[in-house]
Amino acid sequence: MKKVSDIHAIKIIFFITATYVGLWAIRIPTIKDQLQTDYVGVGYIMLSFAIGSIVAMIFANALILKTSTKSILTCTLIAEGCLWLPVPFIHELWLFMVFSFVFGMSYGAFEIACNVYASNLEVREKKSMMSGFHAFWSLGVLFGSLITSFLLEWNYSFIFNILLYVIILLPLSLYFVLCLESQVETKSEDSSKKNIFFIWPLLIFLLALIAMANALTEGSVDAWGALYMRDFIQV
């Protein structure tokens, strides 16, 4: 069988992980009811996830330099699939927060590795492709949300929903990650200079503010949209 090109493979990997995000976005009310918590408790879960993601992002570059983007993607894709399996059986908020932190670390490392691989493809192919990669991410969120919505409408259980996604998506993600080339990152000649964290120019701060604003709007929809629709609009 002809091997899938790494360009198409990384697009599908974006799509697969985003499908899990779609599952999460629609099932947040289910998780809230399962934990018997309030909106503050849901906020703690989101905060734990965000902190875990940030921690992983800080160390992701060093891990990629020691291994490769393909290795990090393989580990995080396996983790993302397996970490979903215990979710329906957790009923304590504090335990779910710890779990959310670990989940966030996996997700953060995945995002860095996946975008690094995509950026290297742009350099290799000498053309802009990032918008196309992220288009598959958006399609994945839409697809995951749509299928989960159908399963909810048809009264399928949360456990069935998760098993269906993991059984299908985990093997697919492993197949497509095997189609990737092994990219080994190397430190640049300027790596010995002072850490850029302390010498960020104004432009970097502006870009960071724009990214934060975008994350706030994205999070308000992804994380709270389903709760708002159920509890206030009563859909």
State each model region's role.
Residues I78-H91:
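C-terminal ends and interior cores of transmembrane alpha-helices
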Residues Q36, S68, F89-W94:
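Helix-breaking motifs and short loop linkers at transmembrane-helix boundaries and internal kinks
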Residues K70-L73:
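Primarily marks hydrophobic transmembrane alpha-helices of the MFS/SLC 12-helix fold
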